[in-house]
Regions:
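Bacterial Sec-dependent N-terminal signal peptides
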Residues: 1-29
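Contiguous, well-ordered alpha-helical segments that form the cores/surfaces of helical PPI scaffolds
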Residues: 5, 13, 328-329, 353, ...
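Beta-strand-rich, non-transmembrane domain signature
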Residues: 24-281, 288, 346, 361-367, ...
């Protein structure tokens, strides 16, 4: 009897445990819009992400073709329900819908219509609906090609459920928008349905590490009144409990690794009547760009600063790099970078009149100027790293968002320039441009091989018997290290704020500070810091000679990783600290030299210490040879960094000599 009672009790407790464990994860959103259910209204945290400020309860996207005015169009029907979990999540009530709508009349375009939104709140135990009025919907032009529809759902606070829906119509029957299954907040349920007429032949690409339900079936639909149905294909994708796309310090574009669906039109095929191949090559892209008035025509134009260049006698400079640098510095006096990246340009006259411009406008002007010096240049079109990688196998203009400039000294030597690198140099570019590119009327080129960050640190210090450590820190920055150092200094409110930040990082008092080369267009910068700090003294002193590390802390601590590791660029840090030990102290045990390598030997760490004639010398070199490490390399990478930081955290033991 006792055994039977315990069995029943165990089953009851186990059932209760399972029901509690699965209570939140079993939330079923109401797929019919206009009436959130009780569970959706009462939920207070995301079942699988307690840090989430909001979550998508339900997102449904339907894509269909319609036939109108003798052509096909695409309609996107989007419906979404969001739960606001905390006050920090109320920004989800601000809705922005970008779409393509050129200023010029005529031509293909997109349009947004049928926008509706409602906020649902529980007030005194009853659900209160607040609909968004039309006066909360605004249209804004982003540029001459893009518009955005903005709206704000009213009465939104922590606990609110938001619903909104709209329809986007597109004249671009050959292009289906990328569908993102994941968003920047967790998604409880999402569905994507696409129906495509049989005459359109698409390639389907599905990416992401999370599992989606997928089905495909043949169907029929009449697109013209009183006509026979056309054969179609229906694709359906569903996802549940998808995590948020979160920022990561070692991933440039987290959305690139999220679950998403891409359709690429391969051909239009009407058997026996019509066939057209829509697969584009880089040759096609090159031809389109060079025919474009805002790209190819900008390259072909003359030099608007020819007289200024002649007056500056730039053509008489014999050194190639100095000649190019002098040309850019003349241009820089006329036009500053406005912080934006672009692929297409504006009128040279307007750019020079305005005095500030995108990197593209600056690049076009430099190409015009160098052409007058008989220096060959070529645009290198690319996609900045924060927007994802460039699809080299199926290129499209839509995948490009800017370009850099290849500058040829001769047939075998090319330098890369970009107008956004105001504090850089030839081959010294912002990290977001260090990616695969395509040279127009040329070939593929990986700008990353131009990127290298080098830093050389030498510290000479004296440790006094009262514990005062005084020294001179000297650091030389090269390449991308120089660019980052200059940017960091210039982003500070003033030099006092910047020096205070450095003092905090060094855990020292800074008596004198200088940074040379900060305003120069050069690949180098030089830093000098005169410092002092207190060391606890006694019969035994634990002294850490590593005042600077490649990264402030161990960069990788998570046991698992769903995304690759992307460093800004290859890097090399060399460090050497010389410390004069006070009289009356000695060092009995100096750490043995050590070499550590990552599993693929693409990161190497070397360290060595010596003690001679009262001088302690500690050095290390840290060399990252490649910038990208895939997920399967992460465990070895994590263990390697842990081992490196164990070495960097080692202390030297000083012992007082008995008198």
């Amino acid at each position: 009897m006792k055994k039977q009672f315990l069995t029943i009790l165990f089953i009851a407790l186990y059932t209760l445990f399972c029901s509690n464990a699965n209570a939140q994860s079993s939330i079923q959103p109401n797929l019919k819009f206009g009436n959130p259910n009780k569970e959706e209204m009462s939920i207070t945290t995301c079942p699988y992400d307690s840090s989430a400020k909001a979550m998508v309860l339900c997102s449904i996207t339907d894509v269909s073709y319609i036939y109108a005015v003798n052509t096909f169009k695409i309609e996107y029907s989007i419906k979404k329900r969001i739960k606001i979990l905390s006050q920090e999540g109320v920004d989800e009530a601000n809705i922005s819908i970008p779409y393509y709508s050129p200023q010029a009349s005529g031509g293909s375009r997109e349009a947004i219509r049928s926008i509706k939104a409602t906020a649902y709140n529980m007030v005194n135990g009853k659900m209160v609906k607040t609909k968004m009025s039309n006066d909360l919907i605004f249209e804004e032009r982003l540029d001459k090609q893009q518009m955005v529809t903005k709206s704000t759902v009213p009465q939104v606070k922590a606990g609110t459920v938001i619903e909104y829906q709209y329809i986007k119509s597109s004249d671009f029957f050959y292009h289906i928008d990328t569908w993102m299954a994941q968003e920047t907040i967790p998604t409880l349920y999402t569905a994507y349905d696409v129906e495509i007429p049989g005459i359109f032949v698409f390639n389907l690409e599905q990416t992401g590490s999370k599992s989606l339900q997928y089905s495909q079936e043949a169907a029929n639909r009449a697109y013209i009144t009183n006509s026979d149905p056309e054969q179609t294909t229906r694709y359906s994708f569903k996802g549940n409990n998808l995590p948020a796309i979160k920022s990561d310090p070692f991933v440039w574009c987290p959305a690139m690794y999220a679950n998403k669906i891409d359709f690429e039109l391969r051909s239009i095929n009407i058997p026996g009547q019509y066939y057209k191949n829509f697969t584009t090559s880089w040759q096609d892209i090159d031809e389109m760009l060079m025919k474009d008035e805002d790209f190819g025509d900008r390259i072909k134009r003359g030099n608007p600063l020819k007289d200024e260049m002649k007056a500056a006698r730039i053509d008489t400079i014999s050194d190639f790099k100095r000649k190019v640098a002098a040309t850019y510095l003349l241009l820089k006096k006329k036009v500053k970078w406005d912080g934006s990246y672009a692929l297409f340009g504006n009128s040279s006259r307007n750019v020079l009149k305005e005095g500030k411009a995108s990197n593209a406008d600056i690049n076009f002007l430099l190409m015009n100027m160098l052409k007058s010096l008989n220096i060959k240049t070529a645009p290198m079109v690319l996609r900045t790293r924060n927007q994802g990688s460039l699809p080299l196998t199926h290129p499209s203009i839509e995948s490009l968002n800017t370009f850099a400039v290849g500058i040829y000294e001769n047939d075998t030597t090319m330098y890369v320039f970009d107008g956004s690198a105001e504090k850089g140099y030839l081959d010294v570019l912002p990290a977001k441009l260090l990616t695969n590119a395509h040279i127009v009327n040329g070939g593929e080129y990986n700008i990353m091989k131009k990127g290298a960050a080098k830093q050389s640190i030498i510290i000479k210090a004296t440790l006094k018997s009262d514990g005062q450590l005084e020294g001179l820190y000297t650091s030389k920055y090269y390449g991308n290290s120089s660019l980052r150092k200059k940017a960091s200094f210039l982003e500070a409110k003033d030099s006092t704020e910047y020096v205070s930040k450095i003092a905090k990082e060094m855990n020292a008092n800074i008596q004198k500070y200088s940074l040379n080369g900060i305003h120069k267009y050069s690949p180098q910068a030089y830093e000098k810091i005169q410092f002092d700090k207190n060391i606890d003294m006694g019969d035994i002193v634990y002294f850490s000679p590593m005042m600077e590390k490649p990264f402030r802390d161990v960069p990788f601590t998570a046991e698992k990783r769903d995304m690759p590791v992307e460093f800004d660029c290859p890097m090399l840090v060399s460090y050497n600290m010389l410390v004069k030990i006070p009289q009356g102290y000695t060092i009995e045990d100096v750490p043995q030299p050590k070499i550590l390598r990552s599993p693929d030997s693409n990161i190497i760490f070397r360290t060595q210490s010596q003690y001679n004639d009262g001088i302690l010398s500690t050095m290390y070199t840290f060399h990252i040879k490649k910038a990208l490490f895939f997920q399967d390399e992460y465990p070895g990478l994590k263990n390697f960094f842990e081992d490196v930081y164990k070495e960097l955290d080692n202390v030297i033991v000083l012992k007082k000599i008995s008198q």
